[in-house]
Amino acid sequence: MNRTPIQLFVPHFRIDESLDAVRTCMERGWTGLGFMTVDIEQKWKEYTGVKNAHFVNSNTAGLHLALDVLKRRRGWADGDEVITTALTFVSTNHAILYCGLTPVFADVDEYLCIDLASLLERITDKTRAVMFVGIGGNVGRYLEVLEICRSRGIAVILDAAHMAGTRIDGHHVGPEADVAVFSFQAVKNLPTADSGMVCFADDADDALARRLSWLGISKDTYERTHGGGAYKWMYDVDELGYKYNGNSIMAALALVALKYLDDDNAERRRISALYDSLLGGIDGIE
Protein backbone atom coordinates (compact mmCIF):
# COMPACT_ATOMS: atom_id res chain seq x y z
CA MET A 1 0.00 0.00 0.00
CA ASN A 2 1.29 3.44 -0.93
CA ARG A 3 1.49 5.85 1.97
CA THR A 4 1.82 9.58 1.49
CA PRO A 5 3.98 11.08 4.23
CA ILE A 6 2.63 14.03 6.16
CA GLN A 7 5.27 16.76 6.03
CA LEU A 8 5.47 18.37 9.44
CA PHE A 9 8.17 20.95 8.78
CA VAL A 10 7.33 22.74 5.55
CA PRO A 11 6.96 26.53 5.81
CA HIS A 12 3.67 28.01 4.68
CA PHE A 13 4.06 31.33 2.86
CA ARG A 14 1.49 33.65 1.29
CA ILE A 15 3.61 33.70 -1.82
CA ASP A 16 2.12 36.53 -3.86
CA GLU A 17 1.82 38.84 -0.88
CA SER A 18 5.33 37.97 0.28
CA LEU A 19 6.79 38.61 -3.17
CA ASP A 20 5.06 42.00 -3.29
CA ALA A 21 6.61 42.92 0.06
CA VAL A 22 10.08 41.83 -1.06
CA ARG A 23 9.61 43.72 -4.32
CA THR A 24 8.91 46.89 -2.33
CA CYS A 25 12.32 46.55 -0.66
CA MET A 26 14.07 46.01 -3.97
CA GLU A 27 12.31 48.90 -5.71
CA ARG A 28 13.22 51.21 -2.86
CA GLY A 29 16.80 49.96 -3.00
CA TRP A 30 16.91 49.09 0.70
CA THR A 31 17.23 45.40 1.50
CA GLY A 32 19.40 45.55 4.61
CA LEU A 33 19.06 46.87 8.15
CA GLY A 34 16.39 49.57 8.45
CA PHE A 35 13.18 50.30 6.54
CA MET A 36 11.23 47.03 6.93
CA THR A 37 13.20 46.03 10.05
CA VAL A 38 11.94 49.19 11.74
CA ASP A 39 8.38 48.29 10.74
CA ILE A 40 8.51 44.71 12.03
CA GLU A 41 9.97 45.86 15.35
CA GLN A 42 7.10 48.29 15.84
CA LYS A 43 4.47 45.76 14.76
CA TRP A 44 5.94 43.14 17.09
CA LYS A 45 5.80 45.52 20.04
CA GLU A 46 2.17 46.28 19.25
CA TYR A 47 1.31 42.58 18.86
CA THR A 48 3.06 41.29 21.99
CA GLY A 49 3.18 44.27 24.34
CA VAL A 50 6.96 44.02 24.81
CA LYS A 51 8.72 47.30 25.62
CA ASN A 52 11.62 46.77 23.23
CA ALA A 53 11.97 44.61 20.12
CA HIS A 54 15.19 44.22 18.14
CA PHE A 55 15.06 42.29 14.86
CA VAL A 56 18.08 40.01 14.44
CA ASN A 57 19.20 37.37 11.96
CA SER A 58 18.25 34.37 14.13
CA ASN A 59 16.98 33.25 17.49
CA THR A 60 20.49 31.91 18.14
CA ALA A 61 21.94 35.40 17.71
CA GLY A 62 19.23 36.77 19.99
CA LEU A 63 20.00 34.26 22.74
CA HIS A 64 23.70 35.09 22.55
CA LEU A 65 22.93 38.81 22.79
CA ALA A 66 20.55 38.18 25.70
CA LEU A 67 23.19 36.43 27.76
CA ASP A 68 26.06 38.67 26.68
CA VAL A 69 24.18 41.85 27.57
CA LEU A 70 22.95 40.57 30.94
CA LYS A 71 26.42 39.29 31.82
CA ARG A 72 28.03 42.64 31.00
CA ARG A 73 25.42 44.85 32.63
CA ARG A 74 24.87 42.76 35.76
CA GLY A 75 28.48 41.90 36.41
CA TRP A 76 28.25 38.14 36.04
CA ALA A 77 31.53 36.23 36.14
CA ASP A 78 32.82 33.43 33.95
CA GLY A 79 31.56 30.15 35.33
CA ASP A 80 28.37 31.60 36.79
CA GLU A 81 25.40 29.30 36.27
CA VAL A 82 22.32 29.39 34.06
CA ILE A 83 19.67 26.76 34.77
CA THR A 84 18.34 25.36 31.52
CA THR A 85 17.03 22.18 29.91
CA ALA A 86 18.57 19.62 27.60
CA LEU A 87 15.21 19.21 25.84
CA THR A 88 15.75 22.01 23.34
CA PHE A 89 17.66 22.84 20.18
CA VAL A 90 21.41 23.22 20.70
CA SER A 91 21.24 27.01 20.27
CA THR A 92 19.80 27.46 23.76
CA ASN A 93 22.79 26.00 25.51
CA HIS A 94 25.42 27.04 22.97
CA ALA A 95 24.51 30.63 23.82
CA ILE A 96 25.26 29.99 27.49
CA LEU A 97 28.66 28.54 26.63
CA TYR A 98 29.44 31.36 24.17
CA CYS A 99 29.41 33.71 27.16
CA GLY A 100 31.65 31.62 29.40
CA LEU A 101 28.73 30.67 31.63
CA THR A 102 27.87 27.20 32.91
CA PRO A 103 24.66 25.45 31.82
CA VAL A 104 22.99 23.51 34.64
CA PHE A 105 20.41 21.06 33.36
CA ALA A 106 17.07 20.72 35.10
CA ASP A 107 14.53 18.00 34.34
CA VAL A 108 11.28 18.70 32.51
CA ASP A 109 7.69 18.18 33.60
CA GLU A 110 4.70 16.70 31.79
CA TYR A 111 4.51 19.86 29.65
CA LEU A 112 8.13 19.31 28.51
CA CYS A 113 9.12 22.57 30.24
CA ILE A 114 11.38 23.07 33.26
CA ASP A 115 10.15 21.12 36.29
CA LEU A 116 9.72 23.23 39.42
CA ALA A 117 11.14 20.72 41.89
CA SER A 118 14.14 20.07 39.68
CA LEU A 119 14.67 23.82 39.28
CA LEU A 120 14.62 24.43 43.03
CA GLU A 121 17.14 21.64 43.60
CA ARG A 122 19.61 23.26 41.20
CA ILE A 123 19.58 26.84 42.45
CA THR A 124 22.91 27.75 44.08
CA ASP A 125 24.69 30.94 45.08
CA LYS A 126 26.16 30.96 41.55
CA THR A 127 22.79 30.85 39.76
CA ARG A 128 22.38 34.03 37.73
CA ALA A 129 19.56 33.17 35.32
CA VAL A 130 16.98 30.60 34.34
CA MET A 131 16.49 29.88 30.66
CA PHE A 132 12.85 28.87 30.26
CA VAL A 133 12.20 27.05 26.97
CA GLY A 134 8.57 27.12 25.87
CA ILE A 135 8.89 24.02 23.75
CA GLY A 136 6.04 23.53 21.30
CA GLY A 137 4.60 26.85 22.46
CA ASN A 138 3.81 25.36 25.89
CA VAL A 139 3.95 27.64 28.92
CA GLY A 140 4.17 24.82 31.45
CA ARG A 141 4.61 26.36 34.90
CA TYR A 142 6.25 29.49 33.56
CA LEU A 143 4.43 31.83 35.96
CA GLU A 144 5.66 29.81 38.94
CA VAL A 145 9.20 29.87 37.53
CA LEU A 146 8.95 33.65 37.27
CA GLU A 147 7.84 33.89 40.90
CA ILE A 148 10.71 31.68 42.08
CA CYS A 149 13.26 33.74 40.16
CA ARG A 150 11.86 37.13 41.18
CA SER A 151 11.97 36.19 44.86
CA ARG A 152 15.66 35.27 44.54
CA GLY A 153 16.94 38.01 42.24
CA ILE A 154 17.53 35.56 39.38
CA ALA A 155 17.11 36.76 35.80
CA VAL A 156 14.56 35.09 33.53
CA ILE A 157 15.44 34.53 29.89
CA LEU A 158 12.52 33.23 27.86
CA ASP A 159 13.60 31.12 24.89
CA ALA A 160 10.38 31.76 23.00
CA ALA A 161 11.51 30.18 19.73
CA HIS A 162 8.19 28.32 19.50
CA MET A 163 6.04 30.94 21.22
CA ALA A 164 5.00 33.48 18.59
CA GLY A 165 1.34 33.95 19.45
CA THR A 166 1.50 32.19 22.85
CA ARG A 167 -0.67 33.86 25.48
CA ILE A 168 -1.38 33.37 29.17
CA ASP A 169 -4.79 34.64 30.30
CA GLY A 170 -5.02 36.66 27.11
CA HIS A 171 -1.61 38.31 27.47
CA HIS A 172 1.22 37.49 25.08
CA VAL A 173 4.34 36.06 26.72
CA GLY A 174 7.50 38.15 26.72
CA PRO A 175 6.95 41.45 28.56
CA GLU A 176 7.29 39.79 31.98
CA ALA A 177 10.78 38.32 31.31
CA ASP A 178 14.09 40.16 31.62
CA VAL A 179 14.53 39.22 27.99
CA ALA A 180 12.50 37.11 25.56
CA VAL A 181 13.85 35.76 22.29
CA PHE A 182 11.59 34.66 19.43
CA SER A 183 12.44 32.67 16.30
CA PHE A 184 11.14 33.41 12.82
CA GLN A 185 13.08 30.57 11.20
CA ALA A 186 11.48 28.83 8.22
CA VAL A 187 9.77 26.01 10.14
CA LYS A 188 8.54 28.12 13.06
CA ASN A 189 4.95 29.30 13.31
CA LEU A 190 5.94 32.77 12.06
CA PRO A 191 8.18 31.77 9.14
CA THR A 192 10.73 33.78 7.19
CA ALA A 193 13.90 32.12 5.91
CA ASP A 194 15.78 32.85 9.13
CA SER A 195 15.44 35.70 11.62
CA GLY A 196 14.34 36.43 15.16
CA MET A 197 13.46 39.07 17.71
CA VAL A 198 15.20 39.81 21.01
CA CYS A 199 13.05 41.76 23.47
CA PHE A 200 14.64 43.32 26.56
CA ALA A 201 12.57 44.76 29.39
CA ASP A 202 15.29 47.32 30.14
CA ASP A 203 15.98 50.17 27.70
CA ALA A 204 19.72 50.25 28.42
CA ASP A 205 19.96 46.50 27.78
CA ASP A 206 18.21 47.02 24.45
CA ALA A 207 20.53 49.87 23.49
CA LEU A 208 23.62 47.77 24.20
CA ALA A 209 22.20 44.81 22.26
CA ARG A 210 21.61 47.05 19.24
CA ARG A 211 25.23 48.24 19.28
CA LEU A 212 26.59 44.74 19.77
CA SER A 213 24.48 43.32 16.93
CA TRP A 214 25.94 45.94 14.55
CA LEU A 215 29.64 45.29 15.28
CA GLY A 216 29.69 47.66 18.25
CA ILE A 217 29.07 50.66 15.99
CA SER A 218 27.29 53.61 17.59
CA LYS A 219 24.90 54.28 14.68
CA ASP A 220 23.71 51.85 12.03
CA THR A 221 23.64 52.61 8.32
CA TYR A 222 19.93 53.39 8.26
CA GLU A 223 20.27 55.93 11.07
CA ARG A 224 23.24 57.57 9.35
CA THR A 225 21.35 57.74 6.06
CA HIS A 226 18.00 58.99 7.35
CA GLY A 227 19.11 61.17 10.24
CA GLY A 228 18.66 64.37 8.26
CA GLY A 229 21.13 66.10 6.01
CA ALA A 230 23.91 64.31 4.18
CA TYR A 231 25.05 60.75 4.84
CA LYS A 232 26.96 60.62 8.13
CA TRP A 233 30.33 59.01 7.56
CA MET A 234 31.53 59.56 11.11
CA TYR A 235 30.67 57.01 13.79
CA ASP A 236 32.24 55.40 16.83
CA VAL A 237 32.97 51.73 17.41
CA ASP A 238 32.37 51.58 21.14
CA GLU A 239 32.97 47.89 21.72
CA LEU A 240 33.69 44.57 20.08
CA GLY A 241 30.44 43.37 18.54
CA TYR A 242 28.88 40.90 16.13
CA LYS A 243 27.13 40.89 12.75
CA TYR A 244 23.72 39.84 14.06
CA ASN A 245 21.42 42.44 12.49
CA GLY A 246 18.29 41.44 10.61
CA ASN A 247 17.55 42.66 7.09
CA SER A 248 14.57 44.10 5.26
CA ILE A 249 13.98 41.04 3.05
CA MET A 250 13.42 38.83 6.11
CA ALA A 251 11.44 41.60 7.79
CA ALA A 252 9.17 41.88 4.74
CA LEU A 253 8.37 38.16 5.00
CA ALA A 254 7.79 38.49 8.74
CA LEU A 255 5.38 41.41 8.31
CA VAL A 256 3.23 39.33 5.97
CA ALA A 257 3.37 36.25 8.21
CA LEU A 258 2.42 38.28 11.29
CA LYS A 259 -0.89 39.25 9.69
CA TYR A 260 -1.88 35.57 9.57
CA LEU A 261 -0.22 34.33 12.76
CA ASP A 262 -3.36 34.05 14.89
CA ASP A 263 -5.28 32.25 12.14
CA ASP A 264 -2.37 29.88 11.53
CA ASN A 265 -2.07 29.11 15.24
CA ALA A 266 -5.81 28.45 15.42
CA GLU A 267 -5.41 25.89 12.64
CA ARG A 268 -2.56 24.24 14.54
CA ARG A 269 -4.77 23.98 17.62
CA ARG A 270 -7.52 22.42 15.49
CA ILE A 271 -5.12 19.78 14.18
CA SER A 272 -3.78 19.13 17.68
CA ALA A 273 -7.31 18.64 19.00
CA LEU A 274 -8.00 16.22 16.16
CA TYR A 275 -5.00 14.10 17.15
CA ASP A 276 -6.16 14.17 20.79
CA SER A 277 -9.62 13.04 19.75
CA LEU A 278 -8.53 10.24 17.44
CA LEU A 279 -5.73 8.90 19.62
CA GLY A 280 -7.37 9.43 23.01
CA GLY A 281 -9.12 6.06 23.08
CA ILE A 282 -5.99 4.00 22.43
CA ASP A 283 -4.57 2.16 25.42
CA GLY A 284 -1.11 3.34 26.42
CA ILE A 285 -1.48 6.81 24.91
CA GLU A 286 -2.06 9.72 27.26
Language-model features, listed with the residues they occupy:
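Active-site phosphate-binding strand-loop segment of PLP-dependent enzymes
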Residues: 111-192, 197-205
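Active-site region of PLP-dependent enzymes
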Residues: 163-169, 176-286
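Conserved PLP-binding active-site segment in aminotransferase class I/II-type PLP enzymes
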Residues: 1-77, 98, 150, 273
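Aromatic/hydrophobic pocket-lining residues that form π-stacking "cages" and hydrophobic walls in ligand
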Residues: 92, 145, 209
